[in-house]
């Protein structure tokens, strides 16, 4: 397993994302490069739970190396990692691809587990804003359906949990088979999908108390 934490920084005007290249979904933002790296490392333990579910060992300590800085865009400043790294254009080696897809699957498992134990009504912000549990889940699932289209995977609107599982299985299969067709690079797609799932799984956890 990688022990050096290779990170690329996605630098928007208002937000900077620190993205762990070898660990899809482990992406956090702050207002400066240094703060974004600190925020990334602050989530090491939480991301470690995902690695355990995937059967992958996350090293306890990391030698952080920033390998690239890319300009962010409006989506970066909105709060989502939006710009691929240059290395994403290179095909992932088979073991790395399998490992990263397993981490994506583990993020789905974590979200399902968190949702199953969360209250239906989540704690709101100071002005009463924010989604409740089921609305968060609906948002994640619909976003995934849109993301999947960027890889050539098209599914009609969901009518049951089985439809969600089928779409996710097809998405993982397409990524593993190298059959993805669309504007998103596979490495970036795995990172973005996994980040979105984890960001909302952690949101549900944080707002369940």
Positions of PLM-derived features:
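Short, contiguous alpha-helical
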Residues: 6-8, 14-33, 37-56, 101, ...
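A non-catalytic, amphipathic alpha-helix used as a structural packing/dimerization or gating element
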Residues: 36, 103-106, 110, 166, ...
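Short, charged, surface-exposed hinge/linker loops at domain edges
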Residues: 45-96
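Charge-rich, acidic-biased intrinsically disordered regions
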Residues: 64-67, 132, 163
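Long amphipathic alpha-helical segments with strong coiled-coil/leucine-zipper propensity
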Residues: 93-105, 116-117, 122-123
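Transmembrane alpha-helical segments of integral membrane proteins
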Residues: 171-178
């Amino acid at each position: 397993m990688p022990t050096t934490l290779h990170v690329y920084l996605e630098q928007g005007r208002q937000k900077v994302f620190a993205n762990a290249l070898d660990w899809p979904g482990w992406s956090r933002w702050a207002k400066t490069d240094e703060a974004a790296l600190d925020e990334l490392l602050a989530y090491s333990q939480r991301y470690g739970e995902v690695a355990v579910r995937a059967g992958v060992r996350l090293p306890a300590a990391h030698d952080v190396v920033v390998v690239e800085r890319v300009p962010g865009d409006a989506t970066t400043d909105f709060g989502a990692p939006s710009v691929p790294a240059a290395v994403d254009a290179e095909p992932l080696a088979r073991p790395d691809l399998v490992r990263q897809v397993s981490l994506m699957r583990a993020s789905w498992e974590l979200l399902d587990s968190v949702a199953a134990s969360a209250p239906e009504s989540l704690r709101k912000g100071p002005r009463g804003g924010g989604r409740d549990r089921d609305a968060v889940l609906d948002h994640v699932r619909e976003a995934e359906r849109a993301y999947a289209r960027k890889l050539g995977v098209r599914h009609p609107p969901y009518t049951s949990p089985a439809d969600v599982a089928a779409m996710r299985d097809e998405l993982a299969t397409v990524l593993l088979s190298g059959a993805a067709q669309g504007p998103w690079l596979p490495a970036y797609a795995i990172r973005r999908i996994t980040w979105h799932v984890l960001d909302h799984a952690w949101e549900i956890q944080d707002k369940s108390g």
